[in-house]
From Swiss-Prot:
UniProt topology in membrane: Multi-pass membrane protein
Subcellular location: Cell membrane
GO cellular component, one term: plasma membrane
Keywords for this protein: Cell cycle, Cell division, Cell membrane, Membrane, Transmembrane, Transmembrane helix
Name the UniProt record assigns to this protein: Cell division protein CrgA
A single GO BP: cell division
Transmembrane segments: 31-51, 60-80
Secretion signal, residue range per the UniProt entry: none
Disruption phenotype: Inactivation of the gene abolishes most sporulation septation in aerial hyphae.
Organism of provenance: Streptomyces avermitilis (strain ATCC 31267 / DSM 46492 / JCM 5070 / NBRC 14893 / NCIMB 12804 / NRRL 8165 / MA-4680)
Length: 84
């Protein structure tokens, strides 16, 4: 069986040096605290509603208090989309 020709290697060229790039995080320092606050407010709203048997946080809303709690949680997820 015939042997393959050996290819000649090209001269060595060093890889280009990598330069440090600045990563701009933006001025979104408010996002994480607001997001966590919304999550916790929503969770607390629902827990208080169940623990007090519906008399708190707002008695007139009745079972809509659950929707308000989940609304706060959904708003927290909405704020989380701004996190970079």
């Amino acid at each position: 069986m015939p042997k393959s020709r050996i290819r000649k290697k090209a001269d060595y060229t060093p890889p280009p040096s990598k330069q440090a790039t600045n990563i701009k995080l933006g001025s979104r320092g408010w996002v994480a605290p607001v997001m966590l606050a919304m999550f916790l407010i929503g969770l607390a709203w629902i827990v208080v509603f169940y623990v007090t048997d519906g008399s708190l946080p707002i008695d007139a809303l009745d079972n809509w208090n659950i929707v308000v709690g989940f609304g706060f949680i959904a708003a927290g997820f909405g704020v989380s989309t701004q996190w970079k």
